[in-house]
Amino acid sequence: MKRGIPWGASFVHFVIGAYMSVYIHGGLRSPIGVLNGQYKNTRPEILGAQLINELIKGHEINSVDGIFCGNAVGTGGNIGRLMGLMSNLSVSTPAVTIDMQCASALMSIEMAYTHIASGV
């Protein structure tokens, strides 16, 4: 069985036993801005929703099992959930936000992998 998650580094392949492989089939990141720069009036969940929509565009994805959002220096709340609500995904798509500063992106990939590999 092969399942992909639409975030993280491209072309990463994990093998789980002899039965299941987990693939990360694409990756993007939000733009990096500066204080009072071009994104000063743009909410981070809007940028995240644009990333989600861009990642699922061009792929035959019928549903997304979950959103795992790595976030540093957040303003509070579940930005992963807000991203999902503002994207083209179903409102029933669950989401979690991981806030570990510099380690949040890697931890979100690890959590998504564990979630998929365990069959949850």
Where are these regions (language model features)?
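N-terminal amphipathic/hydrophobic targeting modules at extreme N-termini
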Residues: 3-5, 9-11
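Conserved "HGTGT" condensation-loop signature of ketosynthase/thiolase-family condensing enzymes
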Residues: 13-93
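Active-site-proximal alpha-helical scaffold in enzymes
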Residues: 100-120
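Active-site nucleophile and cofactor-binding loops and adjacent substrate-binding regions
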Residues: 72-73, 95-104
